[in-house]
């Protein structure tokens, strides 16, 4: 197997109300082109930026904590101008902070450093049009060490990272992910693949690029240190330019942005606001509740799903076993949501309503199927499962006199099934059972019904 080293620079938009250095709104998706702009985010001469958006810094620190990073505390920090010439960068430079947190780790991949920077605008090369609504939206940049050894490892890491970022609740849903992937093979030159905008795209780009470099080496050709672009339609990478160094970007401190510090108070505030990271939460839940790590990992794929599970466990009677709750929360309700293409965030049922339903199941007052039917309707309804059960009369019918009358009707209406049963065909009684269930709309107690059917059929000899 080839000796491969892969590292990432991952960029994701932070969900703030205003941009990083001005008061323009960050909600640009539904805006007209260049509607949410001002002289600062369009790089007008003489325009002076505001001090850095503190909420953006705070969110970045929350995410740094979730990635087990150390804050760069109590020392002067500043924003730099990273110079390059592109139509979507009106000032000719991008403002990016020096590292605000370092030395993190996620699933065995070291996080070298975290920065905050401003997003450039949107340029459409085919038309030449530039929309600066996005210009100045705050980004977090997460830089890893080259610790991944295959496209599969890289893909798994990005999936986990995006899970952590979504868990924070502080990244923009429409901002997506933009990845610069650095890859070297067999100790050769490092090649950067710029601006890949999906995890699937990163995986495909890495597979192609690794094979490209191996093919060059096989034929004795040099792998050049360069920057390449991923062509999604072809699944290939193409050369853009020779690989830049820090000197090429002509980094200088931005004289218009005041120096700032990350104080202990600011860091403690970020830590207090940050949710428990999903990878930590899964380990804790497995240990605390005695469920498998695999089950816990499934629950934490959605923050609201894990929240729901833990709240049900907390509020349910003490004598309920975890296996029962796990079966209904992790499997049954999730199965329904998947079929309806819903997330837990969209589900309308509350933990209290769910517990009421499970109480009926545990007390054997409703059949499992009718409980599932009520749950199916409740997840996207304003009615609770119990309200649906009461409105539709879905509780079990255990009254033997009533059930005996229904059994008698079914036997009279299905003489062929009765004859089949008496000739030894056991499946016939299950057919008759189904007819009783149909007449009672699934409310008949299965055990009582089966006993009454056998007693009635066997009594005829």
Curated annotation (Swiss-Prot):
Catalysed reaction(s) here are: L-glutamyl-tRNA(Gln) + L-glutamine + ATP + H2O = L-glutaminyl-tRNA(Gln) + L-glutamate + ADP + phosphate + H(+); L-aspartyl-tRNA(Asn) + L-glutamine + ATP + H2O = L-asparaginyl-tRNA(Asn) + L-glutamate + ADP + phosphate + 2 H(+)
Top-level taxon of the source organism: Archaea
Name the top EC class: ligase
For molecular function, the Gene Ontology terms on record are: asparaginyl-tRNA synthase (glutamine-hydrolyzing) activity; ATP binding; glutaminyl-tRNA synthase (glutamine-hydrolyzing) activity
> What InterPro entries would the database entry show?
Asn/Gln-tRNA_amidoTrfase_suB/E, Asn/Gln-tRNA_Trfase_suB/E_cat, Asn/Gln_amidotransferase, Asn/Gln_tRNA_amidoTrase-B-like, GatB, GatB_C_1, GatB_Yqey_C_2, Gln-tRNA_amidoTrfase_suB_CS
Q: Example GO biological process term?
A: translation
Alphabetically sorted, this entry's keywords are: ATP-binding, Ligase, Nucleotide-binding, Protein biosynthesis
Give the enzyme's EC designation: 6.3.5.-
Looking up HAMAP family in the UniProt record yields: GatB (MF_00121)
Name this polypeptide is given:
Aspartyl/glutamyl-tRNA(Asn/Gln) amidotransferase subunit B
Origin species, per record, is Methanopyrus kandleri (strain AV19 / DSM 6324 / JCM 9639 / NBRC 100938)
Q: Which gene encodes it?
A: gatB
């Amino acid at each position: 197997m080839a000796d491969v080293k892969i590292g990432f620079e991952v960029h994701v938009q932070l969900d703030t109300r205003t941009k990083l250095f001005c008061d323009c709104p960050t909600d640009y998706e539904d805006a007209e082109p260049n509607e949410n702009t001002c002289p600062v985010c369009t790089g007008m001469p003489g325009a002076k930026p505001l001090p850095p958006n503190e909420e953006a810094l705070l969110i970045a620190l929350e995410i740094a904590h979730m990635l087990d990073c150390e804050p760069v505390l109590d020392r002067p920090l500043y924003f730099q101008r990273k110079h390059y010439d592109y139509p979507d960068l009106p000032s000719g430079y991008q403002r990016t902070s020096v590292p605000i947190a370092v030395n993190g780790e996620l699933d065995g991949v070291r996080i070298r450093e975290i920065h905050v920077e401003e997003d450039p605008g949107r340029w459409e090369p085919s038309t030449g049009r530039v929309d600066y609504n996005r210009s100045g939206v705050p980004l977090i940049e997460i830089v890893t060490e080259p610790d991944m050894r295959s496209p599969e490892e890289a893909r798994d890491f990005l999936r986990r990272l995006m899970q952590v970022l979504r868990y924070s609740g502080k990244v923009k849903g429409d901002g997506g992910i933009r990845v610069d992937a650095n890859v070297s093979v067999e100790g050769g030159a490092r090649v950067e693949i710029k601006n890949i905008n999906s995890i699937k795209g990163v995986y495909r780009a890495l597979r192609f690029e690794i094979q490209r470099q191996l093919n060059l080496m096989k034929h004795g050709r040099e792998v050049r240190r360069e920057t390449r672009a991923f062509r999604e339609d072809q699944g290939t990478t193409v050369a853009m330019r020779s690989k830049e160094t820090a000197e090429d970007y002509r980094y200088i401190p931005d004289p218009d942005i005041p120096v700032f510090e990350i104080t202990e108070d600011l860091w403690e505030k970020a830590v207090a606001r940050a949710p428990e990271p999903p990878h930590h939460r899964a380990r804790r839940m497995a240990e605390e509740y005695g469920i498998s790590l695999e089950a816990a990992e499934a629950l934490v794929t959605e923050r609201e799903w894990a929240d729901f599970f833990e709240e049900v466990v907390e509020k349910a009677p003490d004598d309920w076993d975890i296996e029962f709750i796990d079966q209904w929360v992790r499997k049954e309700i999730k199965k329904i949501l998947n079929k309806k293409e819903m997330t837990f965030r969209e589900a309308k049922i509350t933990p209290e309503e769910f517990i009421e339903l499970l109480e009926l199941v545990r007390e054997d007052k409703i059949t499992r199927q009718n409980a599932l039917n009520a749950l199916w309707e409740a997840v996207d309804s304003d009615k609770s499962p119990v309200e649906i059960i009461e409105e539709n009369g879905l509780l079990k019918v255990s009254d033997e006199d009533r059930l005996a009358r229904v059994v008698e009707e079914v036997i009279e209406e299905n003489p062929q099934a009765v004859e089949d049963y008496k000739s030894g065909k056991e499946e016939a009684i299950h057919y008759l059972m189904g007819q009783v269930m149909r007449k009672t709309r699934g409310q008949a107690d299965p055990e009582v019904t089966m006993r009454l059917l056998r007693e009635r059929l066997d009594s005829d000899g």
